[in-house]
Amino acid sequence: MAKTYADLLQETKGQIKQVSLEDLNTRIQAGEKITLVDVREKDEWRQGYIPDAVHLPRGFLEMQAGSKLPDKNAKLVVYCAGGVRSAFAAKALQDLGYTDVESANPGYGQWKDKGFPITSPFAFTDEQLDRYSRHLLLPEVGEKGQQKL
C-alpha cells in the first residue's frame, strides 16, 4: 500500500532530531556554534528571519547544499515556517551526508510570536520590484546593487 503524506511526515520525523524553539534560543544565546538553515521561500525570507541564518529554499536544497553548507560535520539546525519543510529538509541533508542535523519545531512563525530575535532584509515594494525588474535581473546590479542606487 502506498504511503500517505501523513505517513511520510511521521516516518521522516522519526528519522531526524528535532529541537524546540526554546532550546534553540537558549543554545544560540549561550553562544553554541550552530549554522541555522532557513528553507522557506524568498518571499517568506523577506518578511524576516533568524539572525545569521543561511537562506537555502527547500526547492534548491539538494542542488545548493554543497556550496552553501560546505562543512558536512557542522551543527545544522533547519527551520521553516511551521516545522514540516524543515523536517523533510533535515532528512535530505542527512541523506546527503551531513552528520549533525536538527529540525526546529514548530518554526519561524512561532519563533517570531515568542519574541525571539529576528532580523529583516531590505525589502522592495511591489511597485519598486515592477519598476526595477530589468535591473534586478542583471547579475552586475541585482537587488544589492539596486538598493545602493
Give the residues covered by each predicted segment.
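Rhodanese-like catalytic fold shared by cysteine-dependent sulfurtransferases
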Residues: 1-35, 42-75, 81-147
